[in-house]
Amino acid sequence: MHEPRKLYVKSFGCQMNVYDSHRMADTLAREGFVETQDPAEADLVILNTCHIREKAAEKVYSELGRLRKQKQEAGSDTMIAVAGCVAQAEGAEIMRRAPVVDLVVGPQSYHRLPELLAEAKAGKRVVDTEFPAEDKFDHLPAPTRAATRSRGPAAFVTVQEGCDKFCTFCVVPYTRGAEVSRPVAKIMDEAARLVDQGVREISLIGQNVNAFHGAGPDGTTWSLARLMEHMARLDGLARLRYTTSHPRDMDDDLIAAHRDLPQLMPYLHLPVQSGSDRILAAMNRKHGRDDFFAIIEKMRQARPDMALSSDFIVGFPGESEKDFEDTLDLVRRVGFASAYSFKYSPRPGTPAADHDAQVPEEVKAERLAELQRLLEASKAAFDESCRGRTFDILLEKPGRQAGQLIGRSPYLQSVVVNDPPAAIGDLLTVTITDVGPNSLAGVPAEASEPSVSQSPVSSARSRPLAAMEA
């Protein structure tokens, strides 16, 4: 009996890459591959890449250099594939820079992996970055029950890909293509299958998810709000989320869904990028700061317990001190529970990359640090406001200590619970007793509170809140 071939997949970047990595693994499982967590023992390594910032792309080449050295030292014949947005953007250039790569495959061709691998194994240098007309989702197999259970009780479902917004800093329209929405029936089939396999929480994902306009089973075009209303009726589905959204597509129906659907979590990730109207216009965001404030006000009226997350770019070409102060002002006024902040990174082929007024790196670094301090304080204040409150926590995985389980709050916070009277996949009502820099701790709502000295998070080391260049 032959040993099964081993597959190692490493995902960089967004949730959609995680979803795509799972689907690639499901596809290759049919070819006899089993996943491993050790690239050294893999017969095939896939790097599923992100191209949104220069540092993210360069991480891929660093990883390829490490894999090349590993192959040479071990004398192995491991095949190496580069997938994702770097593959789409750079194509054959990847093989020129890193000859160790056997296969380059773009996001729309994952269903062709078995035949592409066969070509690569036969000695061909394979690059497939086409945007085929057929729906790749029609050709990707569903995960097995065992695969779904191994990934935990929370799952992603892609409902939309691509973006038509063409923000001047962004490569997504070029690497993922135009906006395409999946048919409602296919989405519902996938969601129902996941719930049947034990999933309790589904996050609907897309590059611009709230632009969803899928063909409904009744012959009409469905919005994201209507899709979620339908999905919320699935027996056994406890939670719904969606990401990533664009302010231009936050309509009243979607806001009302947060009011009307108890399964829809009171947490919204809504990237604003800048608090300056001048910079927002230069970014081609097609909304202003007052538009953003109006959305937040409506959202909080519809769902008073709503918490917000966002993305920010500092040092966009032409950003003045006044523009940056406008961003700080927006952060103070909104009060974010979490946020991601980045230095502007010029991406080849985007309009902003050719802008004359590039901001010096040292200025970008100073502004990022200042913004990060403010966002960190905002996050800490929100986390502290959760102390003493009671939430339903979805238990997702074991903790580091015996008897611990770790779950997620409605606000995506990691919550540690000692010896819970529940199992992974259960929703447990928990009272938050302690707040650490990276997680919360709690006890079952009917239990007594532990002392601070017993807290599993009280001594945790702090880390910056997603302060990134990549």
Curated annotation (Swiss-Prot):
Keyword Amino-acid biosynthesis in annotation: no
EC code: 2.8.4.3
SMART domains cross-referenced by the UniProt entry: Elp3
Binding-site residues, [4Fe-4S] cluster 2: C163, C167, C170
Subcellular location: Cytoplasm
Residue span, TRAM domain: 384-446
Stretches for region Disordered: 439-470
The keyword Iron is assigned to this record: yes
Gene3D superfamilies named among the record's database cross-references: Methylthiotransferase, N-terminal domain (3.40.50.12160), tm_1862 like domain (3.80.30.20)
Chain ranges of the MTTase N-terminal domain: 5-122
Residues the record lists as binding [4Fe-4S] cluster 1: C14, C50, C85
Ranges of Low complexity composition bias in the record: 444-464
Cofactor(s) the protein needs: [4Fe-4S] cluster
Xref: InterPro entries: Elp3/MiaA/NifB-like_rSAM, Methylthiotransferase, Methylthiotransferase_CS, Methylthiotransferase_N, Methylthiotransferase_N_sf, MiaB_methiolase, rSAM, rSAM_horseshoe
Radical SAM core domain span: 149-383
Similarity field: Belongs to the methylthiotransferase family. MiaB subfamily.
Primary role: Catalyzes the methylthiolation of N6-(dimethylallyl)adenosine (i(6)A), leading to the formation of 2-methylthio-N6-(dimethylallyl)adenosine (ms(2)i(6)A) at position 37 in tRNAs that read codons beginning with uridine.
Record-given protein name: tRNA-2-methylthio-N(6)-dimethylallyladenosine synthase
Provenance organism: Xanthobacter autotrophicus (strain ATCC BAA-1158 / Py2)
Gene name of this polypeptide: miaB
